[in-house]
C-alpha cells in the first residue's frame, strides 16, 4: 500500500481544482483518519506560511496528467463477502480506516437487509 500522498494546494480559478499549483508536499497516510487529517492541516499550514512569505511560485497544472475523483456515495462503502476473498486483511483495514466520519461508514449487509457498520478494525497476525 502507498503510505504517502502529495498535498497540492492551488489558486482558485474558473474551473474546479484547475488553478495553478502553489506547492506540493508529500505527507504520511499512517494512522487513523483523524491523525491523517491533522497531518494534512500541518502540511497545509506550512504551505500557507510559505505562500504568505513569498516563497511559492504558482505553477500551471498539467491537465493531461490531472486525476479526478467523484464524491463517495454510501453504497460505495459496502464491504461484500467477495472482498474477503479478493483483498488482504491490510487492504480491507485501509478501506475501513479511510471511511470514517465525515465519510459514509463502511458496512456489511446482513440478514433482513440490516447493516453492520464497521467503526474500527485492527490487523493482527498473532491471533
Q: Could you describe each region identified by the protein language model?
A:
Residues 1-71, 75-79:
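Donor/substrate-binding cores of folate-linked one-carbon enzymes
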Amino acid at each position: 500500500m502507498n503510505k504517502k500522498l502529495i498535498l497540492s494546494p492551488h489558486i482558485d480559478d474558473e474551473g474546479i481544482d484547475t488553478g495553478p499549483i502553489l506547492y506540493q508536499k508529500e505527507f504520511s497516510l499512517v494512522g487513523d483518519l483523524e491523525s491523517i487529517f491533522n497531518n494534512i492541516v500541518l502540511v497545509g499550514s506550512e504551505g500557507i506560511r510559505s505562500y504568505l512569505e513569498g516563497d511559492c511560485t504558482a505553477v500551471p497544472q498539467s491537465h493531461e496528467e490531472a486525476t479526478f475523483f467523484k464524491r463517495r456515495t454510501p453504497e460505495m462503502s459496502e464491504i461484500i463477502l467477495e472482498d474477503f476473498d479478493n483483498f488482504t486483511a491490510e487492504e480491507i483495514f485501509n478501506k475501513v480506516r479511510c471511511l470514517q466520519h465525515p465519510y459514509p461508514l463502511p458496512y456489511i449487509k446482513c440478514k433482513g437487509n440490516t447493516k453492520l457498520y464497521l467503526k474500527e478494525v485492527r490487523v493482527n497476525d498473532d491471533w
